């Protein structure tokens, strides 16, 4: 990733946009379309670096996949005819690819090695290895916690498992492995997490029963899978940057169309509503994932907020940009119970506080979150994404609060989830 980018966006931001397809759903659609025998088309997918890593892995397993500008076309021989790859399956910077594909590979009966970049090499994998081994998977890693992961054929058993962390990636690793289990599997959630794996299993004809915090899978659920086409909604995590930009920039009025508003992911909407920001949802649809158009307007008198409990996993990827939003509230905001942020691409608690404090804002990192005081952009300094796409985009939005350009090191990390992020912001600047 190259070094510094000088970022300057001029408000007000006015106009109507769409954001790239949802990253979580694109990953899962590629995986499920590849497992099914036949043709599946994914419309409006996210073509960021993470999702393209998932594409490359299934190509190496013998699936024909064609990536176009606005769709991914899959023609698969089916999971029974996957071939053994004769090279390491490289997941890049993608935690989703690493953890979900690991769960899937455990049941496939293929010997494989999964490895990612330096950042992935620091992220904990024991959280998936423990339940997968409980299912009789043969999976090992460095110090039983880090990539590369070595996966060997094993007969997968169904389990009853109580989640120890609120992590959709861990839950999904278990669910993908359970497709190959000889007995039913039951998972009890620790806290509600994004449910895209469950909704997309249903879309690809795999039976799954969800009752409050209990998820049940039948034995050998993989045998039910059928190919399917899927239209990917816009990613609410990407929309969040434009939502906050509109709320904090005088004179702004932004509408984002076709955004996924799955209730397990829509914490950002609840946060803005509680802060009394000017936000409206319309054009709502619900098949198979709920979507809406979201309009935001400049909101100078927002209230502070306490974020904890089940609101945290529902907004986990948005906490850095929410922290910036909270600096513009008229009182002190608190984020608690967000320890999960410590094991993302960076320690997002510390990185968010450190980078914003460099610019004159006032944030205090805590063991499990942040204390955010009303504060302003007071001085330009060279900041750094530390190769974390969400930190890079948050800092670009922070530049709206300054009259000067902001130098952001390692800014092209944003390409992981939002290629074309800056041009999209500039589009609203031009229309304004």
Swiss-Prot record:
Catalyzes the transfer of the enolpyruvyl moiety of phosphoenolpyruvate (PEP) to the 5-hydroxyl of shikimate-3-phosphate (S3P) to produce enolpyruvyl shikimate-3-phosphate and inorganic phosphate. Pfam families: EPSP_synthase. Belongs to the EPSP synthase family. 3-phosphoshikimate binds at residues 23-24, 28, 167, 169, 317, 344. One of its GO terms (molecular function) is 3-phosphoshikimate 1-carboxyvinyltransferase activity. This is 3-phosphoshikimate 1-carboxyvinyltransferase. It is found in: Cytoplasm. InterPro entries: Enolpyruvate_Tfrase_dom, Enolpyruvate_Tfrase_sf, EPSP_synthase, EPSP_synthase_CS, RNA3'P_cycl/enolpyr_Trfase_a/b. Pathway: Metabolic intermediate biosynthesis; chorismate biosynthesis; chorismate from D-erythrose 4-phosphate and phosphoenolpyruvate: step 6/7. Monomer. It comes from the Bacteria. The keyword Cell inner membrane does not apply. Keywords: Amino-acid biosynthesis, Aromatic amino acid biosynthesis, Cytoplasm, Transferase. Its EC number is 2.5.1.19. It is an enzyme of class 2 (transferase). It catalyses: 3-phosphoshikimate + phosphoenolpyruvate = 5-O-(1-carboxyvinyl)-3-phosphoshikimate + phosphate. The active site is at residue 317. PROSITE patterns: EPSP_SYNTHASE_1 (PS00104), EPSP_SYNTHASE_2 (PS00885).
């Amino acid at each position: 990733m190259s070094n510094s980018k000088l970022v300057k966006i001029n408000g007000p931001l006015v106009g109507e946009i769409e954001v790239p397809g949802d990253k979580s759903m694109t990953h899962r659609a590629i995986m499920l379309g590849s497992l099914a025998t036949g043709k599946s088309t994914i419309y409006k997918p996210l073509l960021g670096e993470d999702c393209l890593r998932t594409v490359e892995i299934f190509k190496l397993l013998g699936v024909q996949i064609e990536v176009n500008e606005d769709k991914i076309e899959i023609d698969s021989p089916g999971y029974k005819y996957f071939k053994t790859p004769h090279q390491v399956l490289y997941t890049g910077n993608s935690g989703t690819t690493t953890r979900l594909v690991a769960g899937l590979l455990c049941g496939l009966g293929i010997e494989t090695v999964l490895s990612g970049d330096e950042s992935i090499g620091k992220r904990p994998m024991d959280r998936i290895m423990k339940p997968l081994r409980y299912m009789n998977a043969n999976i090992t890693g460095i110090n039983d916690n880090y990539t590369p992961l070595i996966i060997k054929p094993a007969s997968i058993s169904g389990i009853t498992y109580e989640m120890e962390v609120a992590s959709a990636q861990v839950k999904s690793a278990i669910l993908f492995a359970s497709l190959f289990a000889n007995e039913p599997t039951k998972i009890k959630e620790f806290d509600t997490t994004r449910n895209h794996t469950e909704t997309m299993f249903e879309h690809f004809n795999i039976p799954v029963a969800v009752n409050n915090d209990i998820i049940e899978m039948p034995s050998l659920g993989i045998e039910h899978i059928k190919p399917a086409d899927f239209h990917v909604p816009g990613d609410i995590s990407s929309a969040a940057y434009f939502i906050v930009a509109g709320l904090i920039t005088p004179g702004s009025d932004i509408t984002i169309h076709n955004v996924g508003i799955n209730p397990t992911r829509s914490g950002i909407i609840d946060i803005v509503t509680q802060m009394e920001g000017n936000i409206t949802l319309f054009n709502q649809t619900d098949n198979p994932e709920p979507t809406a158009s979201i309009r935001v307007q400049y909101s100078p008198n927002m209230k502070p907020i306490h974020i904890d409990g089940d609101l945290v996993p529902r907004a986990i990827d948005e906490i850095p940009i929410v922290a910036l939003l909270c600096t513009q509230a008229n009182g002190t905001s608190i984020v608690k119970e967000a320890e999960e942020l410590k094991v993302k691409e960076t320690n997002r608690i510390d990185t968010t506080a450190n980078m914003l404090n460099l610019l004159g804002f006032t944030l205090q990192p805590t063991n499990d979150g942040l204390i955010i005081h009303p504060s302003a952009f007071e001085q330009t300094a060279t900041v750094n994404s530390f190769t974390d796409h969400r930190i890079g985009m948050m800092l670009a939005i922070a530049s709206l609060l300054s009259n000067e350009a902001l130098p952001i090191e390692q800014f092209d990390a944003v390409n992981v989830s939002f290629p074309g992020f800056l041009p999209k912001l500039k589009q609203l600047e031009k229309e304004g």
